[in-house]
Amino acid sequence: MDKTNYRQTEYNKPFIIQRADPYVYRHSDGTYWFTASVPEYDRIILRKSNTVDGLAQAEEVTIWRKHENGIMSVHIWAPEIHYVDNKWFIYFAGGDIEDIWAIRPYVLMCEGDDPLKDPWKEMGMLKPKDAFSFQDFSLDMTV
């Protein structure tokens, strides 16, 4: 990394309370996006700000809620937001209430340009490229 484009900053305080698995994404327009696991592990939230510090006070929007049963009905963990090929995606782990440790990676895609306001579509479980990936406990992945 070119040191003229890098500035180290220390954050010595709690960033956002009651949020596990935090993920911050800096978009090409300079805005920062935040998502994380919530204590109830039942939904996916987003925050947006023009600064990293601003994320702490930014409005939190629930963009998706767990299913009542079946896949994606329990242990909604470790979401990440990414912008790929001009589309917004959230990758996260989720379990099945009938087998709560059958945690697998899933994908949501925003159907518009505004992740805070536009609807999100469930794209399903990530598809493995081999015979062993995602066949067992799978979480905290990245793209």
Task: Give the positions of each predicted feature.
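Carbohydrate-active catalytic/glycan-binding domains of CAZyme proteins
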Residues: M1-V143
